[in-house]
């Protein structure tokens, strides 16, 4: 068998999600609607947080950053997937494949850290209310957000050094709808044990590390909520955290299933389904989850609509 290294390989073939033309058209329309809602919903959330002064808090600052990451992440994956669903030649250049993977890894890392920061913010707000303005001052939360993006860039650089050195044999067919490290490791004819271990460690540090921050923060939050004497106070505090917990469960469940299970149990078809959730569906659901569960967001949206109606009559 002739061996090709990454310098001689010019393109990959993405098998995608469907084999038949009818199913491809249905999926194209379905994902086009989801992508449109994702972009409009998240950009709308960013704009709403920007124009409403009541949402100028650390919690909603992190949410605006999360919405930005969701738009970027979805745009990294979905447009290419939509194009492939309507194309017979589902190819992606070698450089394009690795750029897609690196941007995805960087943005996913940032998203995990933002979830952790949002959990810490809820801990500070509910468990340390008197010190909240000091703990989460503007300088502090700006540095936290900058650190989240810097960590994503660092993970990007570390993955560049070991994944791009993979060698490939005759086959260039990726059994996935986008370029991700697990299917590339499967495709490579290099000895990938060390590289897979490094990738798993990096994913584990990011996912498990931020999850520990989330679990410890919410352990204190729930203890404080149940210690409140006022039923109204408990309901308000729990309602504030419910949307964040819902988004966390959806995101981390699919990420853990995809990246932290043993490689021996790796299933291409099951991984595709899980990947659809955290790359396409969850970015659309996040603004819906936060807007439906948050009284502040609903109030801000009502104020914007009210002002627009008033101005239209003038």
From Swiss-Prot:
A Gene Ontology CC term for this entry? membrane
The encoding gene is: OR5F1
Q: What is this protein called?
A: Olfactory receptor 5F1
Where is this protein localized, as stated in its record? Cell membrane
Q: Which domain of life is it from?
A: Eukaryota
**Topology of the protein relative to the lipid bilayer:** Multi-pass membrane protein
Provide Cytoplasmic-side residue ranges: 47-54, 121-139, 218-237, 293-314
User: Entry's InterPro entries?
Assistant: GPCR_Rhodpsn, GPCR_Rhodpsn_7TM, Olfact_rcpt
Q: Which GO terms describe its molecular function?
A: G protein-coupled receptor activity; odorant binding; olfactory receptor activity
Which residue ranges does the entry give as Extracellular-facing topology?
1-25, 76-99, 161-196, 259-271
Matching entries from Pfam families are given as: 7tm_4
Q: What PROSITE patterns does the entry give?
A: G_PROTEIN_RECEP_F1_2
Q: Which Gene3D superfamilies match?
A: Rhodopsin 7-helix transmembrane proteins (1.20.1070.10)
Q: What does this protein do?
A: Odorant receptor.
Which coarse location class describes where this protein primarily resides? membrane
Q: Which UniProt keywords apply?
A: Cell membrane, Disulfide bond, G-protein coupled receptor, Glycoprotein, Membrane, Olfaction, Receptor, Sensory transduction, Transducer, Transmembrane, Transmembrane helix
Q: List the disulfide bonds.
A: 97-189
Q: Which residues are glycosylated?
A: 5
What are the GO BP annotations of this UniProt entry?
sensory perception of smell
Q: Does the keyword Cell membrane apply?
A: yes
């Amino acid at each position: 068998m002739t061996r090709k290294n990454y310098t001689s390989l010019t393109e990959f073939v993405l098998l995608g999600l469907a084999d038949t033309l009818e199913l491809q058209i249905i999926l194209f329309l379905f994902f086009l609607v989801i992508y449109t809602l994702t972009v409009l919903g998240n950009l709308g959330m960013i704009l709403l947080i920007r124009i409403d002064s009541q949402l100028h808090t650390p919690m909603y600052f992190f949410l605006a950053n999360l919405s930005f990451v969701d738009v970027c992440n979805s745009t990294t994956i979905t447009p290419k997937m939509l194009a492939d669903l309507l194309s017979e030649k589902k190819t992606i250049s070698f450089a394009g494949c690795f750029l897609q993977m690196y941007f995805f890894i960087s943005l996913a890392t940032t998203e995990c850290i933002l979830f952790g920061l949002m959990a810490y913010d809820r801990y500070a707000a509910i468990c340390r209310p008197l010190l909240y303005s000091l703990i989460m001052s503007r300088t502090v939360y700006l540095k936290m957000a900058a650190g989240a993006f810097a960590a994503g860039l660092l993970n990007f650089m570390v993955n560049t050094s070991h994944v791009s050195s993979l060698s490939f044999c005759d086959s260039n067919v990726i059994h996935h709808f986008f370029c991700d490290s697990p299917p590339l490791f499967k495709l490579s004819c290099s000895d990938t044990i060390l590289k897979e271990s490094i990738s798993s460690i990096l994913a584990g540090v990011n996912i498990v590390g931020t999850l520990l921050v989330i679990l410890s923060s919410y352990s204190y939050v729930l203890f404080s909520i149940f210690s409140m004497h006022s039923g109204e106070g408990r309901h308000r505090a729990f309602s504030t955290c419910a949307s964040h917990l819902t988004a966390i469960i959806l995101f981390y469940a699919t990420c853990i299933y995809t990246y932290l299970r043993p490689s021996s149990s790796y299933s291409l078809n099951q991984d595709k389904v899980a990947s659809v959730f955290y790359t396409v569906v969850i970015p659309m659901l996040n603004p819906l989850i936060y807007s439906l569960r948050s009284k502040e967001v609903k109030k801000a949206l009502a104020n914007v609509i009210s002002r627009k109606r008033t101005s239209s009559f003038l």
